[in-house]
Every structure is written in structure tokens, then in C-alpha cells.
Amino acid sequence: MAACVDHDVHVHTYLSDCCADKEHHRPAAILALAREMGVRTIGFSDHVWMNPAIEPSGWYRKQDATQITRLREDLSAIRTPVRVLVGCEADMRAPGQFGITRDFAATLDYTLLSCSHFHMRDFVEQPAADTPGDLARHLLSFFTSGVASGVATSIAHPFLPCGHMAQYDAIVAAISDAAFADAFGAAAANRVAIEVTCAFLPPDDGPRTWSIETPARMLSLAKRAGCRFTFGSDAHCAEHQRKLPLLGR
């Protein structure tokens, strides 16, 4: 049976430096498209770094609390039947090193925490070696730290090895069911949800370097461990946002 995907709580706007369409991907357009698609709740999740104890990267330095201030200013002029949540996508530099504080997280409706931005090679701690086993251990270390952090509502694109997608199948296969059970059990115990993301879907164009069975196995084990789930398109443009219904199939 298809799932009912009535919310999208991972949407970036023009405020995120990685936005693919800064001219058009603005809150009013995002909410209009959500209404057209029948999506009842939109959560805005621009990148933010708000932890003065940890120096941000150059990319993150200009993405601070002003992101939230500007977003709220934009939203104040919009009238929509779509429920609006103001959140962010926060990051980790290493286990125990988070891009936001608990105090900052408390000012938002929710927070997504990324535990796998390994493509930021000059900023995020890297695995011992570029092998499936080492990457698997690195993902587990980041994830278990993230779910215990006290700053995460949901884990963004969990166990998605950014920068190493050619090895995605092999990396996840290197994580045993028992290891996943422990990791997801910790998430459930800490009431941290798991994101079901469009990033799990193999690309429509170009070579398919991973099987849909890889994220399907992981999500099945998360469900067995008692985890809650959030849906997210991880949209950086309208084209990405339109892919959300694919998660219900």
C-alpha cells in the first residue's frame, strides 16, 4: 500500500548557498507549489551554522541566524492554507561537534541534522580510508553521536554517504542488521526521527550506481526498531520539490 506523503519538511530556499534556483525558489513559490500538489505541511530547512564554540567553514560562515530572520520576514507577507514550519538543516564537523546549539534549536519548530556530509573534505572529519568498511564505521559513529546530541528532531538523509555514492550499496551492506538495530534503537530511545528522502531514489537520468533495495533495507530496520519518520524532498528547486510523491510508492 502506498504511503500518504502529506508533508515535506526538507525544503531549501534561495537563502541556502546551495539553492539551484535562487531567483525563483522562494517561500511564496514553494508554498504555492505545495498547495497545488496537495502537500499540507512545508518545513523550511535552510543551512545554518550557529555554534560559536566551533569555527564554521567558509561556506557556512555566512549562513547563520540571519537565515531564519530573513525567512520569517518573507513568510510574514504570505497567506497560505499550507501549514508552515520554520526549521533548519544543521551539520556535524565530527562526532560530538555540532553546527548548532541546543539553545538555538529551541528557537525553531524542528531541526534536521546531517550526519553524512563527507563530501566537505576540508571541513568534516573523514574516514580512515575510502573503503566500504571504513565509511560504514564512520557513518555509524556520526549517526550515533547525532541522535544523542539533543539538537536533532530528525536525521537528514540518514546513512547516505555524500561524496561516496558510487559505493553506496557496498557501504550499507557493510553495516550488519545488528549494528543498524543498535543505531536505530538509540534514535528511537532519544525520540529522533528518520528522514525518508528523495535522495534515496536512484537518478532517472545517467547511470544508476545504487539499488533502491539499499535504502529500503535500512528503513525497514529503522521501522522495526521503533523509529518515527519524516518525509523530505531535500528540494533545492521546484523540480526537486515535485519529486516528493515518489516517496509514497
What is each of the regions a protein language model found here?
Residues 26, 97, 210-214, 243:
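Residues at alpha-helix caps and immediate loop-helix transition turns in enzyme cores, especially N-
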Residues 14-16, 110-225, 235:
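Domain-core and long-helix interface of multi-subunit machines
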Residues 203, 245-246:
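Generic secondary-structure boundary signal with a strong preference for alpha-helix termini
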Residues 1-94, 103, 164-174, 183, ...:
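An N-terminally biased module of ancient metal coordination in phosphate/nucleic-acid-related enzymes
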Residues 98-100, 182, 217-218, 246:
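A short acidic, amphipathic alpha-helical/loop segment
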Residues 37-41, 107, 150-154:
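Short loop/turn motifs at secondary-structure junctions
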Residues 82-128:
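Hydrophobic alpha-helical segments and helix pairs
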